[in-house]
Amino acid sequence: MRIARRKYGCILHHMSWILVGLGNPDKEYDGTRHNVGRDFVAHFKDKLSKKPKVLDLNVYMNNSGGPIKKAVPTKKAAQQLIVVHDELDLPLWRVKISFGSSAGGHNGIKSIEKALKTKDYVRVRVGISPSTPSGKLKRPDAEKITDFVLGKFKASEQEKLKKARKVVGEALELILTEGKERAMTEINSK
């Protein structure tokens, strides 16, 4: 734990951040939609101005909770956890930061919530679904979701993927330097 002094003279006590990107560890999953969180964290972990503790999970996404629980043993510590993951309910390139929200249908997030017994941690949700030219979400049909999330990004999606990576970098910097509330205000309005 460290102590930081703010310009208003109050002393803040806080623990350092823990950063994890969800994904599957095998090489065959590199570059897939489901591994976008893991891939983005690998890209940024050495580039951030403040260095969080980065957890490089060597388990499949749906079993992420156990290893994270070892690094985040209390509900209070969970508030300093940042999880970057794919999000079917957002169009590709869209990034949203949430805190204390439900897993929806994301099994990796469900595993974390079950292990930590809390939803109170930061999620950086990276949209992976296609959208119409007007920006309306085109979520894949239920029976096609597994193939979709385990599929690689198309060449035509690379520009939007670069945009998402840039926004995730901005989100992580804001969380680490100015806090989750400021990051949510800034990033969620994009």
Which stretches of residues belong to each language-model region?
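Nucleotide and nucleotide-moiety/phosphate-recognizing core
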Residues: 2-3, 8-100, 110-125, 131-147, ...
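Conserved TIR/SEFIR loop-to-helix hotspot centered on a Trp-containing motif
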Residues: 103
